Amino acid sequence: IEKAVWRLTGELGEWFGVDAGLLTVGKRADIVVLDPQRLDDSLNQYHEAPMEAFGGLQRMVNRGSAVNHVLINGRVAFSGESFAAELGQTRGFGQFLRAG
C-alpha cells in the first residue's frame, strides 16, 4: 500500500516537477482520507449534481463514497458529505502549481 500511495503522490510530484506529493513539515498538507472498504464499482456509476451558481444546471459528477475527508493546504475542504462553506469563497485552499 505504501508504495502504491507513493506512486500516485510523491512520484508524480517529482515527475511533473511540482513541490507536492509529500507530507513534510513546512509543506502544503493536501490530504484525502478514504475508507478502502468502500472502494468499489459505484465510482463508475452515472450521477448528476446541480451547479447552484448556474441556476441549478445539472452536471455529471463522480461520487467518491469512499472519500471521508479532504484537506487542502491543511484546511478542511470536505468532511462527511459536505464541502466547507468557505471553499471557493476565500483564499488559502491552494494555488495553481506550475510544472518545472
Q: Locations of the language-model features?
A:
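Active-site microenvironment of metallo-dependent hydrolases
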Residues: 1-100
